[in-house]
Amino acid sequence: MRAVTRNKIVNNLYFSTFLIAFASVAIGSVLPCPAHSVDSDSPAVQQHKLQLAHEQELKRKDALSKKI
């Protein structure tokens, strides 16, 4: 193989590797992750929602007891 041909092949290999690496990082930044987010599945979020519901229930009961 001649040196010029070998040089072109190596340059094309490096260039294609760079493009693939750049594209894989760029695609990860553009497309959203299909997995569930960590916050939506965490027990802290569920506990906070339950606490808010409990507080609303207490306020509702307190408002009803004041009417009576």
From Swiss-Prot:
Keyword S-adenosyl-L-methionine: no
InterPro entries assigned: Coa2
Keywords, in A-Z order: Membrane, Mitochondrion, Mitochondrion inner membrane
GO biological process entries: mitochondrial cytochrome c oxidase assembly
Top-level taxonomic group: Eukaryota
Topological category with respect to the lipid bilayer: Peripheral membrane protein
Pfam family, one: COA2
GO cellular component, one term: mitochondrial matrix
Subcellular compartments: Mitochondrion inner membrane
UniProt family annotation: Belongs to the COA2 family.
Function recorded in the entry: Required for efficient assembly of cytochrome c oxidase in the mitochondrial inner membrane. Seems to be involved in the SHY1-mediated step of cytochrome c oxidase maturation. May aid in stabilizing an early COX1 intermediate containing the nuclear subunits COX5A and COX6.
Name of the protein in its database record: Cytochrome c oxidase assembly factor 2
Organism: Saccharomyces cerevisiae (strain ATCC 204508 / S288c) (Baker's yeast)
